[in-house]
Structures are given as C-alpha cells and as structure tokens.
Amino acid sequence: SNRAPDSRWYDAEPWVISDMRGPGVDDIIKKVHAAAQSYPYPDEYRVWPGPNSNTFTAHVAREVPELKLDLPPIAIGKDYLNNGAVFAKSPSGTGVQFSVLGLFGLLAGVEEGVELNLLGLTFGIDPLDPAVKLPIMGRLGPRTTIFRPAIESPAPGPAL
C-alpha cells in the first residue's frame, strides 16, 4: 500500500490507543523500534485474516508489554499470530491468547477482558473497564482514557 500509516481508512479518523509521556519513555521508544524491526512479515499484507497493519500493531504490543495495549475489537488481523503460532501472550502482555491463523481463537487478559474470535471478528466482554466488544460496533460501554503515563511524572514530556 502507498498510504501513510496514520491516514484515514474509509474516511474514519485514526485514533490514539496509547500515549505515554515522562521519565522512562526513551527506553520504551527503543523497544518499539526494535519490535518494529523484528516484525516477521515486513513484505506481506493481506486484509483478511492477516498479516496486516493490525497484525503489526499487535506484534509491537506483544514485544513491548509496557504499552499495555488493548486493541479495538474492530482491528481485524490483531489475532493473527506470528509464524503460525497458536498460543501467545495477549497484545497487552496481561493475558494469554489461542488463535488459529486469526480465524478462530480465544483471548483472556486483564487489559482486554475475554474475547472470542470467529473468522477474524471479535466478540467479548471487559469486566474491569466495563464494555461489550462487538464486530463493526467496537466497544460498547463508558469511554476509556487514552492517556496512560509511562511512569508517574509531574510534567508531561514528548509523546510516543
């Protein structure tokens, strides 16, 4: 694709799923760069079931658990595990995931809640950040904050 990574997708605005600032961020940035370099599918892209841009984001999240990313249920491809694996830690690093080529799977994590993946579509519940997760609709529940300090800090620094 020749599109910019943060460009609109069918006129939808991209949104921030993690914003970390303050002391400790430089180390996280280095880990993100290393994770991006270790992505096993740099020259492959399949919209469904993956690998795609959401597979890449999930890979970086798994490699950098400090991000604690809870990828949106509409992120088709997030459940496509690297190199044919069927078990992995969840993208947030706070749970576990079982997935068969991103087509069928289960995930349970502190950040994500419990998710069922059928044909790349996510159905789930998040009891700790109350929401129901549905394909196309996304998260149904109170809005969550997208700002999470890397380490408690009195003054924000540059964004990641």
Where do the protein language model's features map onto the residues?
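Sparse, context-dependent recognition of short Cys/His-centered cofactor- or disulfide-binding micro-motifs
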Residues: 54, 83, 99-101
